[in-house]
Amino acid sequence: MAKQSMKNRELKRQRTVAKFAQKRAALKAIIASPESTPEARWEAQVALQKQPRDASASRLRNRCRLTGRPHGVYRKFGLARNMLRQAAMRGDVPGLVKASW
């Protein structure tokens, strides 16, 4: 199990990313637009840099929903490999069967 503080930190980051998503997208559009003036582009870059560091989506980490484990997490299920195995053995994951050949 991951520490509760790490889980809470990740939830706080998710909320921050969601809060600033539209504003970041607008600023990035100004920066990437070939029609924008150099001054507008510069102001957009400065405004983007002044936003909180955790507002960037690249700061998010996929964690297991049950344990908070940061590594070995399957995106499709949102579970770490060991929790996915336990859930599959219990039959909690529909359509997932143990491989045999």
Swiss-Prot record:
Stored Gene3D superfamilies: 1.10.287.1480
One Gene Ontology term of the molecular function aspect: structural constituent of ribosome
- Pfam families for this protein: Ribosomal_S14
Gene Ontology BP, a term: translation
Membrane-spanning regions, if any? none
Physiological role: Binds 16S rRNA, required for the assembly of 30S particles and may also be responsible for determining the conformation of the 16S rRNA at the A site.
User: Would you tell me the protein name for this molecule?
Assistant: Small ribosomal subunit protein uS14
